[in-house]
């Protein structure tokens, strides 16, 4: 069984750092004006390249969102954005507009294509159509039940990705016009004002009767992985880095069988709307799915809790185990080779080694120095060391 991907949101470089150092396999973020979270910090220009390089140096993939509807008058800007993304070396594009799909195929034909949840494709026929169009992955709607997800996984010709934690819209993603009608800020243009979180009342309701609790299916990740989900997505490009770190940590723990009530409590404290819901997944629709941000939800993230997750991502995480080969011979330049995965680098000294004057340079000392990888993406694996020149002085030769 292929290991399922942990896909984390990155609305800022600090959030991206939190995702990567907490153990995400991939991150997703927007660039420019053509993504569903235009109010996030996002990445553009040099920041885009810096973000992609940061991730790739740590063996983390980058999925970039171009998941809004684009006007004809914006085609020049769109093409420039696609060229910039293609040049950056990003791994995949998440798309909504089929017109954007055509532009991407013309400019960057080799990049992987993912169908955004904004496309509202939740049927097998729809997924097969996406495959025919060239998509290699579809992001499933949040509104599907576990039986529907299982059926799609068993029959889909392409990879399937699903949200396992984060906000739920009152409407199906990609189909809502409420924000556009009430304030001329369209969700399909990346500018949703979230009017469903405002006080709308129905008879015998809560006073916030369009506001759903956040989804949380992290505890079901092992089951969903066996079902065939390829990627578990965390919503939250507008959330703080500590939230990202906590969600990635919880998901990682779940997939390794170490998920606990502490993970759930931490997530609820960092952000919730009166708790979480599994309503759609369990096909248990009803009033318990609704909730809003009450005062205790806003103030529950204590300084100690924030610091707990800040500590996780403030230090560099070792990704590569390095094998060293060191050769010190009297008639050759010193050679040091470092190998990790499929990469190998060899450096040579500028001159031949000189005999030690005060003390010998031993294998033990060389090993001690090679093990100093702290604060980098590397960790010491093992070493083959050959040192033939050990004597401190001529006097040592006489002993």
Label the model's feature ranges.
Residues 120:
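Beta/alpha (TIM)-barrel catalytic core signal, keyed to glycine-rich beta->alpha loops juxtaposed to Asp/Glu
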Residues 117:
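Residues at the C-termini of beta-strands that transition into short coil/loop
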Residues 40-49:
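Aromatic- and glycine-enriched glycan-recognition loops and surfaces
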Residues 1-22, 26-37, 51-52, 58-86, ...:
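Surface-exposed amphipathic alpha-helical tracts and adjacent flexible/coil segments at the periphery
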